Curated annotation (Swiss-Prot):
HAMAP family named among the record's database cross-references: Cys_desulf_IscS
Localisation: Cytoplasm
Family, as annotated: Belongs to the class-V pyridoxal-phosphate-dependent aminotransferase family. NifS/IscS subfamily.
Protein name: Cysteine desulfurase IscS
Purpose: Master enzyme that delivers sulfur to a number of partners involved in Fe-S cluster assembly, tRNA modification or cofactor biosynthesis. Catalyzes the removal of elemental sulfur atoms from cysteine to produce alanine. Functions as a sulfur delivery protein for Fe-S cluster synthesis onto IscU, an Fe-S scaffold assembly protein, as well as other S acceptor proteins.
Keywords for the protein's UniProt record, in alphabetical order: 2Fe-2S, Cytoplasm, Iron, Iron-sulfur, Metal-binding, Pyridoxal phosphate, Transferase
Active-site residue numbers: 328
UniProt subunit comment: Homodimer. Forms a heterotetramer with IscU, interacts with other sulfur acceptors.
Residues the entry annotates as binding [2Fe-2S] cluster: 328
UniProt GO molecular function: 2 iron, 2 sulfur cluster binding; cysteine desulfurase activity; metal ion binding; pyridoxal phosphate binding
GO biological process: [2Fe-2S] cluster assembly
Keyword Iron: yes
InterPro entries for the chain: Aminotrans_V_dom, Aminotrans_V_PyrdxlP_BS, Cys_deSase_IscS, Cysteine_dSase, PyrdxlP-dep_Trfase, PyrdxlP-dep_Trfase_major, PyrdxlP-dep_Trfase_small
Length: 404
């Protein structure tokens, strides 16, 4: 068993060996290394064909038309292109955008930038289970609302939004619907022939593909127009200029094809391991799951261990690669803004750990994790005066702390 045990699949996934092997065929002189935009010779034609196949594979994963797939450098760029692209193209129709307080920074900071440009953004607060009820979304919509941006699966707590129902609402209200599916594409079934989603951001490195490549789904019927944010050679039907990274795209296509084929069996195994982990730690006193217990992706488990400081717990769990919050913000000592939006106080938010399980996690690793967590929590609480007071029946909310 390799230590530390990797339980941070929501931050990134290792590239599947089958994907890596395929990518190697598209880099060197012996392989297909040409520029897909080179139309005058075989090197270019072969590369273009490889890109077309990968585009089909990504489209099949979400049941879309391959012509609706725009390759980008990842979900962050896809989010930027979708939100800024819609805002700048449709600004004469309205300048109001709706999103939630628990979105990824790539969505929140893009919206903040648009606010500086004169757009108005409503940031909705979720219920304590992390989900925004459809009535709340409808109530926030106005005559001048042009866009709703909402994630499918939350990166920190794993809760799932019902994008089918929300899509119906948006279509009825003539509001463009963007979904950040970085955490759900390749893990949950997505059918864009059925779901009325207009734009969808996808990342390869969250589904065992390479980093640095992603896609944006842009609906053709009814047609969604975007203003480009990257200008140049007019690649990707003018929406995203820049030479296509054939080997990355091939890797993303292969990862999508494997994810589609193995989704059911992968999820059944991951769910078993997730349940095994929770069953092994739920007996620890003052331990709570964050986010809806049912409506969540099976590989995600965000747990608060009361009376344990998150950073000291992370250090105690040095044999486990886990995170507190998302990878993009786990370097900061601020409590997770997602958990704060759920109504958790600073202490509970600080004592939370995100465990995310994936394709290569084993039972042996889960059992070792349970043992490590149980032991570490016990040791840390033994040192905690707060735990001692709590066990003595002191109501800590009534304690007047002296200010030094």
């Amino acid at each position: 068993m390799k230590l530390p045990i990797y339980l941070d699949y929501a931050a990134t996934t290792p590239v599947d060996p089958r994907v890596a092997e395929k990518m190697m065929q598209y880099m060197t002189m012996d392989g297909i290394f040409g520029n897909p935009a080179s139309r005058s010779h075989r090197y270019g034609w072969q590369a273009e064909e490889a890109v077309d196949i990968a585009r089909n594979q990504v489209a099949e994963l979400i049941n879309a038309d391959p012509r609706e797939i725009v390759f980008t450098s990842g979900a962050t760029e896809s989010d930027n292109l979708a939100i800024k692209g819609v805002a700048h193209f449709y600004h004469k129709k309205g300048k109001h955008i709706i999103t939630s307080k628990t979105e990824h920074k790539a969505v929140l900071d893009t919206c903040r930038q648009l606010e500086r440009e004169g757009f108005e953004v409503t940031y909705l607060e979720p219920e304590s289970n992390g989900i925004i009820p459809i009535e709340k979304l409808e109530a926030a919509m106005r005559e001048d609302t042009i866009l709703l941006s909402l994630m499918h699966v939350n990166n920190e707590i794993g809760v799932i939004h019902d994008i089918d129902a929300i899509g119906e609402l948006c279509r009825a209200k003539k509001v463009i619907f963007h979904v950040d599916a970085a955490q759900s594409a390749g893990k949950l079934p997505i059918d864009l022939q059925k779901s009325k989603v207009d734009l969808m951001s996808i990342s390869a490195h969250k589904m065992y593909g390479p980093k640095g490549i992603g896609a944006l789904y842009v609906r053709r019927k009814p047609r969604i127009r975007l203003e480009a944010t990257m200008h140049g050679g007019g690649h990707e039907r003018g929406m995203r200029s820049g030479t296509l990274a054939t080997h990355q795209i091939v890797g993303m296509g292969e990862a999508a094809a494997i994810a589609k084929a193995d989704m059911e069996s992968d999820n059944a195994r991951i769910r078993r391991l997730r349940d095994r982990l929770w069953d092994g730690i739920k007996h620890i006193e003052e331990t709570y799951i964050n986010g809806d217990a049912e409506q969540r992706y099976c590989g995600s488990l965000n747990v608060s261990f009361n009376f344990v400081e998150g950073e000291s717990l992370m250090m105690a769990l040095k044999d486990l690669a886990v995170s507190s919050g998302s990878a993009c913000t786990s370097a900061s000592l601020e409590p997770s803004y997602v958990l704060r939006a759920l109504g958790l106080d600073d202490e509970m938010a600080h004592s939370s750990i995100r465990f995310s399980i994936g394709r290569f996690t084993t039972e042996e690793e889960i059992d070792h994790a349970i043992e490590t967590i149980t032991k570490s929590i016990g040791q840390l609480r033994e040192m905690s005066p707060l735990w001692e007071m709590f066990k003595d029946g002191v109501d800590l909310s009534t304690v007047q702390w002296a200010h030094h």
